[in-house]
């Protein structure tokens, strides 16, 4: 199998090789972002669930976050709505970092693969025109080799889009817990 991969890259043009390396980097980035954000969001979601539970049980009067250190009006024992909204936006901004990478990969990888395919087919037609041979036995292997770049682009886009949707749902769940805390703390008088 390794021999066939080496043979493929030896027979491929520069653009196709560049496209396949680019798509491989996309795939590595997709896996890295997904694993990192999955772990980070799981920790953050657990923390906010516990914080909500503590606020409801009266064990704490604010989320455990640096923004709430000594920012309370001690006379009313309330936090300003602006501070609560700033905290919510900060948590959501932090939790969505990296999602744009998955979005970009899922939308551009198929086009990058298609670009590699088109360039490879153009090179093949150029070579066929030069050699003067245009039989099915000559054209079919060239086109099948060229389509590998498109397949690789689609292969990179599918997990990127799927992981994007999974992480987006986790961010939504986190936002619900954060909003519940904001609502509870805003209603305290």
From Swiss-Prot:
Methyltransferase listed as a keyword: no
Membrane topology (UniProt): Multi-pass membrane protein
Keyword terms of this UniProt record: Cell inner membrane, Cell membrane, Membrane, Protein transport, Transmembrane, Transmembrane helix, Transport
InterPro entries hit by this protein: Biopolymer_transpt_ExbB-like_1, ExbB/TolQ_transport, MotA_ExbB_proton_chnl
Compartments, record wording: Cell inner membrane
Broad class of where this protein is predominantly found: membrane
UniProt key word Protein transport: yes
Residue ranges of the TM segments: 14-34, 99-119, 147-167
Family: Belongs to the ExbB/TolQ family.
Name this polypeptide is given: Putative biopolymer transport protein ExbB-like 1
Lineage per the UniProt record: Bacteria, Pseudomonadati, Campylobacterota, Epsilonproteobacteria, Campylobacterales
């Amino acid at each position: 199998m390794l021999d066939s991969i080496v043979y493929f890259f030896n027979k491929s043009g520069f653009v196709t090789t560049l496209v396949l390396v680019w798509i491989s980097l996309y795939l590595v980035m997709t896996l890295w972002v997904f694993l990192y954000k999955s772990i980070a969001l799981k920790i953050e979601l657990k923390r906010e669930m516990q914080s909500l539970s503590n606020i409801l049980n009266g064990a704490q009067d604010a989320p455990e976050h640096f923004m709430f250190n000594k920012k309370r009006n001690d006379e009313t024992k309330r936090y300003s709505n602006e501070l609560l909204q700033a905290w919510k936006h900060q948590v959501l901004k932090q939790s969505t970092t990296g999602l744009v990478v998955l979005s970009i990969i899922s939308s551009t990888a198929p086009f990058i693969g298609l670009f590699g395919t088109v360039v490879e087919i153009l090179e093949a037609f150029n070579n066929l025109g030069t050699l003067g041979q245009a039989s099915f036995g000559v054209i079919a292997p060239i086109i099948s080799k060229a389509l590998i770049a498109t397949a690789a682009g689609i292969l990179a886009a599918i997990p990127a889009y799927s992981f994007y949707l999974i992480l987006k749902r986790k961010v939504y769940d986190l936002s619900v817990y954060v909003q519940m805390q904001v609502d509870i703390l805003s209603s305290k008088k």
